[in-house]
């Protein structure tokens, strides 16, 4: 890089899974000049495992928050004499493969654990009331091929630092088919919330859709204080 681009004043880098190794990689390429992390965040959907039918498997909120923190510490603050700063993606809401993949905030401004961890890194102080942290959805639907019209139990595994009273919203949506490239707009799949037959506390009963194809079971856990934990698991409804 340094051989072919000797006159670079400042280098801007968009990187996700590889963010923690950027300082070392730049030196290996012969570049010891200033750089800016112009995009970093969770693992990209091009960097994760897929289901057999091609659905990308999203990191859990706790995994995302940990990776935002690691990327910041190892690519931004680890090289203060070279890194001029960075921009996390995305301080806002965006449908890109899912509505939560890169969204650090939900449409109403609710903070995810990823937002909370970045606030603490930037200010040195934790947020006053931390968002719920979802670590799993326990269900036989997860990553499974299933028949149409069958009820399944589901339960979200979540913790809340302040032991707030939590409200839980379940949803089912088709896998997005409007898959853009380079951050292009993607339409949000229509909710099939009527398939949530019952919900009680952290648990729900969900009936699989009647139409074959790829879907996601989604959960949003809110603490009533501006925080939310949200995740999803893919599943596939078989042909009759």
Give the location of each predicted region.
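Short beta-strand edge segments in extracellular beta-sheet folds
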Residues: 234-240
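Extracellular and select intracellular beta-sandwich modules with Ser/Thr-enriched
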Residues: 227-233
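Short, surface-exposed loop/turn segments at beta-strand-coil junctions that are enriched for proline
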Residues: 207-212, 225
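Distinct, well-ordered alpha-helical segments
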Residues: 1-5, 22-26
């Amino acid at each position: 890089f340094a051989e072919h681009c000797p006159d670079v004043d400042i280098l801007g880098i968009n990187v996700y899974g590889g963010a923690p190794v950027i300082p070392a990689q730049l030196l290996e390429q012969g570049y010891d000049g200033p750089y800016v992390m112009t995009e970093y965040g969770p693992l990209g959907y091009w960097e994760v495992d897929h289901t057999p039918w091609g659905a990308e498997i999203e990191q859990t909120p706790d995994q995302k928050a940990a990776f935002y923190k690691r990327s910041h510490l190892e690519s931004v603050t680890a090289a203060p004499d070279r890194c001029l700063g960075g921009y996390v993606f995305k301080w806002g809401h965006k449908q890109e493969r899912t509505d939560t993949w890169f969204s650090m905030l939900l449409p109403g401004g609710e903070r995810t654990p990823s937002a909370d961890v970045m606030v603490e890194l930037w200010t040195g102080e934790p947020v006053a009331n931390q968002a719920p942290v979802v670590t799993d959805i326990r269900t036989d639907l997860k990553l499974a091929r299933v028949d149409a019209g069958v009820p399944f139990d589901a339960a979200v595994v979540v913790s809340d630092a302040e032991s707030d009273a939590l409200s839980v919203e379940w949803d089912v949506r088709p896998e997005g088919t409007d898959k853009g490239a380079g951050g292009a707009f993607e339409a949000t799949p229509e909710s099939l919330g009527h398939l949530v037959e019952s919900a009680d506390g952290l648990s729900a009963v969900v009936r699989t859709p009647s139409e074959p194809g790829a879907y996601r079971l989604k959960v949003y856990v809110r603490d009533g204080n501006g925080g939310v934990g949200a995740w999803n698991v893919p599943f596939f409804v078989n042909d009759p």
